[in-house]
């Protein structure tokens, strides 16, 4: 109960800070009021086309995320078998983490165009994070238990399903939950920066309103993204809690 109270207090402080900033700046073209943003959000839902934008963004996020999750799981499983293999993979993942996201966006736009670039950008950002999270799950398995299990069971598939999977299940789900929310945010960013006005999506919607200098509507879309991201995190925590029980 106290935790929820602190969250409410935190939200109140944010809104209060926003209102104070609005009055200090005294320019709605730079800092719109919370009421203006709320009205813009209402107008956004009245148009109903926003639901298509949400669907398109989620669709691209899910496709890219599932591919990155499966490949991340495969790479993490292979790397968990040997420290040497992990060291071989290390330069690849170091590079993927070190290269700025903007560089990937420019490269993919030049190579594959605006339409498909967001898919690749989400994959390239999510893949190393998923890999590392799952690999840590493998590393947390007690080495003695691994040895005992190998002695008792020589079937690798049965070994994985009956022993390894239950041991890393929480790590797999945690990686899934945390990475999906990140993937969603990256997808929106990729859509915004690729800058196509012909495609549907929340990021493309931001790009359109940026050219119209409609700060109120941009903040309304940003608020919608925050609400959706929070919803994904809440649902993820509920799923994780149910599985742990």
Question: What positions do the PLM features span?
Answer:
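Alpha-helical transmembrane segments of multi-pass membrane proteins
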Residues: 51, 55-64, 97, 161-174, ...
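Glycine-rich helix-loop "coupling/hinge" segments at transmembrane-helix boundaries
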Residues: 110, 186-225
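Hydrophobic transmembrane alpha-helices
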Residues: 92-98, 111, 120-134, 196, ...
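N-terminal signal-anchor transmembrane alpha helix
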Residues: 2-25
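Membrane-cytosol interface at the C-terminal ends of specific transmembrane alpha-helices
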Residues: 114-179
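Transmembrane-helix boundary motif in ABC transporter permease subunits
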Residues: 63-93
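C-terminal transmembrane helix and the adjacent membrane-cytosol boundary/short C-terminal tail
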Residues: 83, 174, 215-245
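Periplasmic/extracellular loop-to-transmembrane helix junction in inner-membrane transport proteins
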Residues: 24-66
């Amino acid at each position: 109960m106290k935790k929820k109270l602190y969250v409410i207090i935190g939200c109140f402080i944010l809104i209060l800070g926003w209102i104070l900033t609005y009055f200090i700046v005294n320019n709605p073209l730079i800092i719109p009021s919370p009421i203006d943003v709320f009205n813009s959000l209402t107008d956004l839902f009245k148009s109903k086309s926003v639901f298509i934008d949400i669907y398109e963004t989620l669709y691209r996020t899910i496709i890219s995320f599932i591919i990155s999750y499966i490949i991340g799981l495969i790479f993490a499983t292979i790397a968990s078998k040997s420290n040497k293999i992990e060291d071989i993979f290390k330069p690849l993942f170091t590079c993927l983490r070190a290269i700025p996201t903007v560089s990937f966006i420019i490269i993919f736009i030049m190579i594959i165009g605006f339409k498909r670039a967001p898919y690749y950008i989400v994959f390239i950002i999510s893949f190393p994070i998923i890999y590392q999270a799952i690999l840590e799950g493998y590393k947390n398995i007690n080495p003695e238990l691994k040895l005992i299990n190998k002695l008792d069971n020589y079937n690798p598939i049965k070994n994985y399903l009956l022993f390894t999977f239950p041991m890393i299940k929480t790590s797999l789900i945690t990686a899934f939950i945390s990475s999906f929310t990140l993937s969603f945010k990256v997808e929106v960013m990729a859509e915004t920066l690729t800058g196509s006005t012909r495609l549907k999506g929340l990021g493309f919607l931001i790009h359109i309103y940026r050219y119209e200098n409609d700060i109120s509507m941009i903040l309304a879309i940003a608020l919608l993204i925050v609400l959706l991201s929070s919803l994904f995190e809440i649902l993820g925590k509920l799923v994780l809690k149910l599985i742990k029980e």
